[in-house]
C-alpha cells in the first residue's frame, strides 16, 4: 500500500526521476526560467525550493549537501553566490509556476517555472 507516500512517480523509475529532477534543477538555476509539463513543474518545486533555502546559509556542509543533490560545481557556486543572497529576506516561495497552454502532439498541460525576482 502507498498510504501517505508523497511524490508523483511520473511513469519513471526512481533513478530516472532522480536524474531528471537533478537535470531540471540545474537548468532552472542556470537559466532561471524553464518550460516543462505541469506535473513535472509542481514536483520540481519540492526539489528546488529546499536547495534555495539551504543556500541562504553558506557553509561547507550545506555546499556539500547541495552538491550531492545537484552534482554540478558551477550551479552550486551560483546557488550560494547569487541565488542564496538574493532570497535572504524571502521566507520561501522562490518559484513561480505559470500555466502556458497545451503541448502539440499529446495535449499535455505545459507550464513555465521561473525564479521570482529574477532580472
UniProtKB/Swiss-Prot annotation:
Any GO MF annotation of the entry: structural constituent of ribosome
One Gene Ontology term from the biological process aspect of the record: translation
Keywords attached to this entry: Ribonucleoprotein, Ribosomal protein
This protein's GO CC annotations: cytosolic large ribosomal subunit
Keyword Ribosomal protein: yes
UniProt superkingdom: Bacteria
Family per similarity comment: Belongs to the bacterial ribosomal protein bL17 family.
Assembly information from the UniProt record: Part of the 50S ribosomal subunit. Contacts protein L32.
Classification via HAMAP family: Ribosomal_bL17 (MF_01368)
UniProt cross-references to NCBIfam families, sorted A to Z: L17
Name of this protein: Large ribosomal subunit protein bL17
